[in-house]
C-alpha cells in the first residue's frame, strides 16, 4: 500500500522544532505551536519587505538632516544631483553625509549650481 505524504509525526516534529523558544503551550502543544509558527512566518514574510522601506526612509531622513544643516532641502538636493549627472543611491549618500561631511558639502554645492 502506498502512503501519500510524509508521516504526521515527522511533520509535527518539524513544527515543534520551529516553535522552540516560544513561551508556554506554544512550544509544547502541536496545535498551539502550529498557529504560532504560521503567524510568525507571516510576520517574517511581511517584515522582510517592510525592512527595505524602513531603511530607505532612514536614509532619506539622514540625507534631509544633512542637507538642511547646509541650507538646502532634500528634494532640491536630489533634483540638483540628477541634473548634474551624479548617480549616487540614497544609501551611499547617507553614508557620505555621516562619515564624510566635507565631501557631502561639495555634493551640495554641485547640486546648488545645477538647480539655480
From Swiss-Prot:
GO molecular function: rRNA binding; structural constituent of ribosome
Keyword hit for RNA-binding: yes
GO biological processes: ribosomal large subunit assembly; translation
GO cellular component entries: ribonucleoprotein complex; ribosome
Pfam families, alphabetized: Ribosomal_L20
Keywords assigned: Ribonucleoprotein, Ribosomal protein, RNA-binding, rRNA-binding
Annotated InterPro entries: Ribosomal_bL20, RIBOSOMAL_L20_CS, Ribosomal_protein_bL20_C
Function description: Binds directly to 23S ribosomal RNA and is necessary for the in vitro assembly process of the 50S ribosomal subunit. It is not involved in the protein synthesizing functions of that subunit.
Family: Belongs to the bacterial ribosomal protein bL20 family.
Name recorded for this polypeptide: Large ribosomal subunit protein bL20
Source taxonomy: Bacteria, Pseudomonadati, Aquificota, Aquificia, Aquificales
Gene this chain is encoded by: rplT
Amino acid at each position: 500500500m502506498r502512503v501519500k505524504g510524509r508521516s504526521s509525526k515527522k511533520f509535527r516534529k518539524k513544527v515543534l522544532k520551529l516553535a522552540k523558544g516560544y513561551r508556554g503551550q506554544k512550544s509544547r502543544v502541536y496545535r498551539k505551536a502550529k498557529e504560532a509558527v504560521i503567524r510568525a512566518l507571516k510576520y517574517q514574510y511581511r517584515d522582510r519587505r517592510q525592512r527595505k522601506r524602513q531603511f530607505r526612509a532612514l536614509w532619506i531622513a539622514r540625507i534631509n538632516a544633512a542637507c538642511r544643516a547646509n541650507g538646502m532641502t532634500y528634494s532640491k538636493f536630489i533634483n540638483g544631483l540628477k541634473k548634474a549627472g551624479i548617480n549616487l543611491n540614497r544609501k551611499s549618500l547617507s553614508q557620505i553625509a555621516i562619515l564624510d561631511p566635507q565631501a557631502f558639502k561639495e555634493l551640495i554645492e554641485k547640486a546648488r549650481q545645477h538647480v539655480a
